[in-house]
Amino acid sequence: WIMGHMVNAIEQVDEFLNLGANAIEFDIDLDKGGIAQITHHGIPCDCGRKCTKKAIFTEYLDNIRQVTTPDDPKFREQLVLLALDLKLQRISSAKAYRAGEDVAKKLLDHYWQRGNSRARAYILLNIPLVEDYEFIRAFKDTLKNEGYESYNDKVGINFTGNEDLDKICDVLEILGFHKQVWQADGITSCFARGTERLKEALEKRDTPGYNYINKVYAWTLVRKSIMRRTLRLGVDGVMSNNPDRVIKVLKEKEFADKFRLATYNDNPWEKFRG
C-alpha cells in the first residue's frame, strides 16, 4: 500500500492518485466539542508541503465516495484504502467518545449513505494516542445503534503516536479488538528516525498467534534511500509525500519480484503469507 500523505484538498485526490498512490491519508480537524469539521493539517507539517489546504469534511466524503464507487464517472479503481488521521490530540480526551459518534454518523450519511452507496474503499481510523481509545468504542457503538454493524468489516484501526507496542496491545484487549489492526511507525519527513520500533512491530506481526498487528507501515518517507531501507525490512506499506518515488523504487531489480501494488482484491486485514 502506498499512502499519499496529507491529501486534504479535494483537488489533491486525483493529484496523488496520478502519482501512483493506491491509498490516501487525510487529516480530520475537530472543534472543541468533538465535531468533525474540516480536512486540515495546519502548521507545522512536513518540510516542503503546504500545511493549510483543506475542505469541508462532509464535502470531502461526498467526493471520495464517487472516486471509490465503480461505474461513477469519477471512479479510480486503484484507490482502495482511506486513512482518516483523527486530530484527537487537539481536543479533550473527554470528547473522544463524542468524536467517534460524529465521525461514524458522517461516514454513514456521506460515504456509505446508509446502505445506498456502492463505495468500496476500506477505512483505517488513525488514532494518535491510546488515551483516546473511547473514540473507537463510540465508533463501533454508533454503527451498532444505527443498525449498520456490517460496516465493521470495512474498518480497521491504527495507533500512530509511536507509543509502546505492549501498551497498545493492552488497549486493544480492553476494546476486544483482535483483528483489523494496522501499526504505524514514523516521524515527519523533516527528521530522521531509526528502525528499532519498526522492527519490533514487524516481529510481532510475524509472530504466530499474535493477532494485534495485521499490517505495518512507515511514515513519512521522501528519500529513496529510506524507502529502500524500509522495504528491505518487509513492511506492508509506506506513507509518502512522493508516491511516484515509491513506484520507481518498487520497479528496481531488488524489489520488483518481491513487492506489488495492493488492489481491491487484497484484504488489508489479513496478514500476508509470502
From Swiss-Prot:
Cofactor note text: Binds 1 Mg(2+) ion per subunit.
Enzyme class: lyase
Record-listed E.C. numbers: 4.6.1.-
Positions annotated to bind Mg(2+): 25, 27, 85
Catalytic reaction list: an N-(acyl)-sphingosylphosphocholine = an N-(acyl)-sphingosyl-1,3-cyclic phosphate + choline; an N-(acyl)-sphingosylphosphoethanolamine = an N-(acyl)-sphingosyl-1,3-cyclic phosphate + ethanolamine; a 1-acyl-sn-glycero-3-phosphocholine = a 1-acyl-sn-glycero-2,3-cyclic phosphate + choline; a 1-acyl-sn-glycero-3-phosphoethanolamine = a 1-acyl-sn-glycero-2,3-cyclic phosphate + ethanolamine
Subcellular localization(s) per the UniProt record: Secreted
Protein name per its UniProtKB record: Dermonecrotic toxin SdSicTox-betaIIB1biv
Organism: Sicarius cf. damarensis (strain GJB-2008)
